[in-house]
């Protein structure tokens, strides 16, 4: 597993006091090492401070800065950390605003700033020159020869590839980090001195998030703090670490002490994102020049205290407000897709089987919303409840009551007589409760629904969800089949929240009460006889495992192409204290086996809308052979 801990630091500084700044930088490095940080980024011109202005022309300051870099190289010997500090660099009688990458006693490379702000409160071109066209130069310092200098430098250790840009470089139309990322950098370091203005922090944060998303990279950002000169502007010491569009860590600005934020970067995840992205591959032709890769080697990037947050419910936003917003958007996608199918076919009726369970409830809610949107009467929604051998009073009554309060055309067809006749026809003992016993019921229900759809001139709406498709937890040509499937890319963990959203925000008290009870009912196909007290005996999660685990496994398998070992590691972190390691391993093995062996069902799926980033449609997201072996994946 390729995880690496990184940090962004803002030391206390004094303007033009190099010795003081050096001491504080060392303190930050030592603290970062204690925290197992392997890459640490300091602000722009952190050795001298950013706001020295015309003092940058003073040879004394430049000499002190050079000596401080040498001091840091000596200080770094034997320390397994790469850190980037900002300082002036004089080359061919020209001064550059530069980043120095220091590791184990050496300057690995010097990266000049490409774009110099020179308007309003900024006038860097008074002192510095742009390094935009400098690539692959070899320079030297008094204490070290053969140092790479240029904007095309990539610093690589194993699968970790690091690129550097400086402050304004991020704010231009095509930042250098775009080309560095296309060339393979998965970690971008930005040494910055971005002054604070009202709402500028929000804009800056969005820039960093968007750039890390666009580059499918991590982004370590460090900006100068409040101890810079305040003659005309104020700096806030904004520190951010982003990964592929999300913020992993961010500080509270305006701190008056040395500060470090840290985060764990998932290198494998970034690699997987790029591997699947065809446009990223195609975009590589735009790289304007050859990159110069500088190889170095971390001794050990293992993390003893792995404290990276792993979301146990990756399909469900943890923030309630965001969750509600997402729920509304999902319903809009489902209803708009279904509306298009009705408009295309010209059909005016829907047929749907209602069991009193979660999936059929969500599907019915989608159909009702669609009919309301199309201004079609709810009486044209033909809802069929089909009690069988395992139907309980609880689910039966919830199905009846829900349809009643929603105002649909409710019908009831008991499948027991037809199933008994079918058992007799095929010579299957009624008391033999095996897969045939179960599938006869599922197929009988589908046959009824299909034939009624023909009779009514309606569209049969499928109710199965993404989690069931992943596990193959459906009867082939039974509940597996429909004319249009509205839940096909909604995982079970998300189904619950969608139903809950309607119960909380869009229901009468009567309907809300029914929905809450449905949410509280154990998930079951109810294909086996109920117990002597009339309760459900066939509980899906007792048979195939907890859906929250399977949804977690599915997300990481499909989203990032994660190996079984990686999924297991992440699951044990995410569900620590919820499930024992042995339980996670058991259900992961079950998931992997079922995911492969049940592909034949997914190869024959009806149409249905893709809602999130993960779908199992054989026409789009998962083109997988039905006879692939899972042995190599266990």
Residue ranges, per PLM feature:
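Enzyme catalytic cores with a strong preference for nitrogen-chemistry domains
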Residues: 1-353, 369-378
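ATP/NTP-dependent adenylation/nucleotidyl-transfer catalytic domains that generate, transfer
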Residues: 5, 21, 158, 215-217, ...
């Amino acid at each position: 597993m390729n995880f690496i801990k990184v940090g962004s630091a803002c030391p206390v500084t004094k303007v033009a006091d190099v010795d003081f700044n050096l001491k504080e930088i060392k303190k930050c490095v030592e603290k970062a090492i204690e925290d197992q940080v392997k890459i640490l980024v300091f602000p722009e011109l952190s050795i001298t401070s950013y706001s020295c202005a015309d003092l940058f022309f003073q040879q004394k300051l430049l000499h002190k800065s050079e000596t401080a870099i040498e001091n840091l190289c000596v200080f770094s010997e034997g320390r397994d950390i790469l850190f980037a500090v900002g300082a002036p660099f004089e080359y061919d009688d020209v001064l550059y605003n530069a980043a120095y990458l220091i590791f184990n006693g050496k300057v690995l490379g010097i990266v000049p700033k490409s774009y110099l702000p020179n308007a309003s409160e900024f006038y860097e071109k008074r002192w510095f020159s742009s390094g935009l066209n400098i690539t692959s130069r070899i320079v030297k310092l008094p204490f070290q020869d053969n140092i790479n200098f240029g904007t095309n430098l990539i610093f690589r250790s194993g699968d970790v590839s690091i690129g550097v840009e400086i402050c304004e470089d991020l704010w231009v139309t095509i930042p250098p980090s775009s080309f560095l990322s296309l060339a393979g950098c998965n970690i971008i370091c930005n040494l910055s001195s971005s002054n604070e203005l009202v709402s500028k922090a929000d804009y800056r944060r969005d820039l960093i998030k968007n750039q890390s998303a666009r580059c499918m990279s991590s982004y370590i950002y460090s900006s100068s703090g409040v101890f810079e000169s305040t003659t005309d502007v104020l700096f806030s010491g904004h520190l951010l670490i982003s990964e592929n569009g999300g913020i992993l860590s961010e500080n509270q600005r305006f701190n008056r002490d040395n500060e470090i934020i840290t985060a764990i970067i998932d290198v494998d995840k970034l690699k997987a994102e790029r591997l699947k992205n065809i446009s990223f591959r195609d975009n590589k032709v735009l790289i304007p020049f050859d990159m110069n890769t500088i190889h170095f080697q971390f001794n050990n990037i293992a993390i003893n205290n792995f404290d990276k947050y792993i979301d146990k419910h990756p399909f469900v936003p943890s923030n309630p407000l965001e969750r509600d917003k997402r729920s509304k958007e999902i319903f809009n996608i489902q209803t708009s897709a279904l509306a298009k199918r009705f408009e295309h076919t010209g059909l005016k009726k829907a047929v749907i089987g209602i069991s009193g369970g979660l999936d059929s409830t969500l599907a019915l809610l989608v159909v009702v919303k669609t009919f309301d949107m199309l201004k079609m009467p709810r009486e044209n929604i033909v809802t069929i409840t089909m009690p069988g051998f395992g139907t309980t009073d609880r689910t039966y009554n919830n199905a009846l009551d829900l349809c009643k309060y929603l105002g649909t055309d409710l019908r009831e067809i008991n499948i027991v007589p037809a199933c008994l006749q079918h058992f007799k026809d095929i010579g299957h003992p009624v008391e033999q409760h095996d897969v045939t016993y179960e599938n006869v019921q599922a197929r009988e229900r589908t046959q009824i629904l299909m034939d009624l759809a023909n009779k009514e001139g309606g569209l049969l709406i499928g109710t199965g969800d993404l989690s069931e498709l992943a596990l193959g937890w459906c009867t082939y040509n039974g509940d597996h089949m429909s004319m249009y499937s509205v839940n096909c890319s909604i995982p079970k963990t998300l189904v619950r929240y969608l139903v809950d959203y309607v119960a909380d925000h869009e229901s009468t008290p009567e309907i809300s009460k029914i929905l809450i009870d449905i949410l509280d009912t154990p998930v079951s196909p109810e294909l086996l006889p109920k117990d002597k007290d009339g309760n459900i005996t066939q509980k899906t999660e007792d048979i195939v495992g907890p859906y929250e685990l399977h949804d977690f496994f599915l997300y990481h398998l499909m989203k990032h192409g994660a190996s079984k070992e990686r999924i297991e590691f992440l699951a044990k972190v995410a569900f620590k204290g919820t499930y024992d390691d042995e339980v996670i391993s058991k259900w992961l093995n079950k998931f992997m086996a079922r995911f492969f062996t049940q592909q034949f069902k997914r190869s024959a799926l009806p149409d249905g809308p893709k809602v999130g980033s993960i779908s199992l449609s054989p026409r789009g997201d998962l083109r997988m052979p039905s006879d692939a072996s899972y042995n190599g994946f266990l």
